[in-house]
Amino acid sequence: ADEAHRGQYGFDEKIVIKENEQGEKEAHTVIGNARIIHDALPNATYIGFTGTPISAKDRNTREVFGDYIDIYDMTQAVEDGATRPVYYESRVIKLHLDQNTLALIDATYDALEQQSDAATIEKSKKMLGQMESVLGADSTIQSLCEDIVNHYEKYRANLLTGKAMIVAYSRPIAMKIYRKLLELRPTWNEKIGVVMTGGNNDPEDWKEIIGTKSHKEELARKFKDNDDPMKIAIVVDMWLTGFDMPSLATMYVYKPMHGYNLMQAIARVNRVFKDKEGGLIVDYVGIASALKAAMKEYTKRDQSRYGDMDIAKVAYPKFQEKLQVCKDLLHGFDFSGFIGGSPLM
């Protein structure tokens, strides 16, 4: 099975209540795919290939396929030059979120990890609804977009091809981000695009922006074209898996994610591209703890190397190393005027 997390799991038998066309409730028995396949082929050998193993209730990679035969971890991939390292920068403080909001975000992460029974799922739905209100507040969206614009223009716009992705919490919030960015930068009309699924009940102005399937395909073509003026894609779920774009180097995260979903998302920025030293994850919702937890699903070697996601501790020593190279090149020259002199006219 390729991509071993997709549809291969489930040893349990569950009873699910659904409504028929007449509005009557009916009970249906649902049996997990893993049990069906194992019962049908009891003597078969099961081998799975995945970059994101799962360890959750009724969804456990090793429970279905057995222990690991071989591991090609992120550390090895970076050492081999197959991928680039991913760096992390927290900018949660820029949104001026209060302690109650931060506590709600933490509770949401817990709910995402524990969706196992009806009561927990119902509780998590309530939390997710609260998150929609908090993260979608006009003042928060204003702070978010102002900081993204400032960060992008200062540090990322002129890096490589300037391609970046904004991961929004929901479809309504994605639209708010899109409109606020255009309000702040009216000339960005060709620079940004929204990529998400549409619905029959969407407002007409949404439909014009979301477009048809062919429109999304055109956006993908434009975004992958390094010379195209489209530089920033606003997404919710689409393009977070299976979208390969080597020049993409920046991801702004405004959506709580955890586990394999988080690992797959950040992998969008670790592809190899000319002169690309690494990808950057800019965090606005406090994913650091979730990222560390996700790392526990990987090898001890990766945990020791990537366990501390503080970019200052990881990248600053490299900056000092490069700075020393510059100092060595200028050895014997008096460059004090460059540091303390007036700007060149």
Q: Which role does the model predict for each range below?
A:
Residues E3:
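Walker B catalytic acidic pair
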